[in-house]
């Protein structure tokens, strides 16, 4: 009987990935390193259990302990964000956004969200995404001079297109977002305001970024990224009335059985996020990003979009290096620094090529990196990107990476 026999090929790949993570400086802004406790929760016997429905309202028997797990996740999240309503069942951030759209809109309604070339997400209205196929979507951009959100321009666009829903939030924007300005715009045109805080949820939880919870109608987030939890989604609101609509949109609207082993991982992560040391971690995340910003701002060839960061990430304009974002990503992969290509504002190149890079500090901060380490990483990146064909310099960069990953092991 081979029940439980491990696949050698599968486990070799898993072990290789673990070694890759150990040997690599991870700068993808949406990635982080979960605790052993989160991994244990995800690998628990909860993966065996089906539990359609919600706590104390299940369609299956034997859910008494599952109910406890899911309720803990809800209660921890409510406390973490001071929310009246929480749904922890969405399988991803995209599923969370889809559920909100289904709860509040009908097909063909107008959504106004941040354009992808300005730092928005696929689910904020991209034509290739369900959001752009089911709804009529428009994208707002950035002020071309400051590369920051221009709330007057967004107001003018909202008055023109008359959206039923405005989406605030971004996947590649390094500045503080003014939720009250978005509330004013939404009220002016009679639209719902949804905030997608997937990237900055950890900053919101600790007060490092202003909270949208008292201001927005609905807030969505992922549970990984800065929250340092398992991959998944969550929906929050100050309104329990809207919450009832959203619950129906999640189940039975777009999902069946929830992934209770992942929800257990979410509960464990939220518990960790409620501890005092988590706020210290988030503060260090921002300090590390700002330490990297200082290095890049001294470069003659690498430009920080908008000139600074106020959160966990930076977008780098590589135009003067002669490298595309794809070139730079591949080059840095060679020296064991993982990043992702990113469009810069009004990027002339395709999303598959781009003219920029997005880098973030959550994962390196989880490993223990401080400001001086983050500065060293930025210097290594600058050396590589400005000497892309100098093998000797690239070997020096790889050596510097190895020194840092050895100094700060993954576990």
UniProtKB/Swiss-Prot annotation:
Pathway: One-carbon metabolism; tetrahydrofolate interconversion; Amino-acid biosynthesis; glycine biosynthesis; glycine from L-serine: step 1/1
Annotated (6S)-5,6,7,8-tetrahydrofolate binding sites: 120-122, 350-352
A Pfam family it matches: SHMT
Gene Ontology biological process: glycine biosynthetic process from serine; tetrahydrofolate interconversion
Lineage, uppermost ranks: Bacteria, Bacillati, Bacillota, Bacilli, Lactobacillales
Modified residues (N6-(pyridoxal phosphate)lysine): 225
Protein name: Serine hydroxymethyltransferase
InterPro entries reported in the protein's UniProt record: PyrdxlP-dep_Trfase, PyrdxlP-dep_Trfase_major, PyrdxlP-dep_Trfase_small, Ser_HO-MeTrfase, Ser_HO-MeTrfase-like, Ser_HO-MeTrfase_PLP_BS, SHMT-like_dom
Record carries keyword Transferase: yes
